[in-house]
Amino acid sequence: MSDPNANEAEKNIEIWKVKKLIKRLEAARGNGTSMISLIIPPKDQISRAAKMLAEEYGTASNIKSRVNRQSVLSAITSTQQRLKLYNKVPPNGLVVYCGEILTSEGKERKVNIDFEPFKPINTSLYLCDNKFHTEALAELLESDQKFGFIVMDGNGALFGTLSGNTRDIVHKFSVDLPKKHGRGGQSALRFARLREEKRHNYVRKVAELAVQNFITNDKVNVMGIVLAGSADFKNDLNASDMFDQRLATKVIKVVDVSYGGENGFNQAIELASETLGNVKFIQEKKLIGKYFEEISQDTGRICYGVEDTLKALELGAVETLIVFENLEVTRWVLKDSNGAEIIIHSTKQQDAANRDRFMDKETGQEMEVVSQESFLEWIAEHYKDFGTTLEFVSDRSTEGNQFVKGFGGIGGILRYKVNFEQLNEVDDDDEYYDD
């Protein structure tokens, strides 16, 4: 696929999958120390890892507790079998999790996971514990491009970061600077000198705090820095010898904003968006902004809600599918007394409030559950079947929040106008859809 946007969207889906996996693995707990976390970095050898596992097997054979010994040996064997699936370490490295976990009902369940991460994982790890270790995976997500922001005005300064679609305020402080003085004579010179001194101290304090916030272990911890503010403070800082040279070389944009503080930070993100280009926060705002634009222009080229969006997908009408990354909808596949499959999408609240949907209309009994899975996971696997692009969004931007609260966190930008009312009339029963 040569389309960079499509590649970016696919990468975002991979990132989303890893986020979900981390959540699941972090929650898992074992009985004893039989949960194996194995990470092999790129360019390492499968044979080295296999040799190490063989040695571990020998050591584990001496564990005194019979139950724990058997669990550990079983987990090592599962890990060895996973390794046999690979002739060599994939370009981005290899991550393997194997072991027995305790389910919420207290039963033991085997977990065997192996995958190549979406970007190189430069960590070598082997741990046998009562939990899975996901720290290296979490770092992989965090090491997305991060930008630093310094917003200065006459009332104070704010230090912030933007990474992916996560915006953080790292530090802020207020300042009380004397205003320009109107009196003449010697007092005017004295006030001007005092004022200049206070401004100088303010710029110096910002320069010092910039080092504290944006340099870790003598290395700049952001991809680039945006200086923002009203008046000349940002330019004074940029030109000042007090501003650490390592940071000065990272300044990618200087922008004028009308406010200080958090509002100024938001405005600076907007104004620097072109320079930041690929940061997901901006992409998210643009994408949902485009969705809202279709609504305000009344083009009819949008859909929202699970059911209408699925109908539009079935028609092949959805150009871009937009889904909230934490959408809590379950996809149920049920079977009625005639053997017909019925698919229902519902939230936990809907399940509790409306059990009628699960009842067979002819017999009045509950229908057989064929399968039950997260709608998000299902759509992440099947979106390509509908000829659409899938974009996950957060609720951290104003637009994202509005999309989740006002439109249920799922919708699409359509290739052409679809008359959903007409489609609903065609459906005999708009609660159930056959595949």
Curated annotation (Swiss-Prot):
Its main location: cytoplasm. InterPro entries: eFR1_2_sf, eRF1_1_Pelota, eRF1_1_sf, eRF1_2, eRF1_3, Peptide_chain-rel_eRF1/aRF1, Ribosomal_eL30-like_sf. Pfam families: eRF1_1, eRF1_2, eRF1_3. It is found in: Cytoplasm. SUPFAM superfamilies: L30e-like, N-terminal domain of eukaryotic peptide chain release factor subunit 1, ERF1, Translational machinery components. The keyword Hydrolase does not apply. Keywords: Cytoplasm, Protein biosynthesis. GO terms for molecular function: translation release factor activity. One of its GO terms (cellular component) is cytoplasm. Directs the termination of nascent peptide synthesis (translation) in response to the termination codons UAA, UAG and UGA. Heterodimer of two subunits, one of which binds GTP. Belongs to the eukaryotic release factor 1 family. This is Eukaryotic peptide chain release factor subunit 1. The lineage of its organism: Eukaryota, Fungi, Dikarya, Ascomycota, Pezizomycotina.
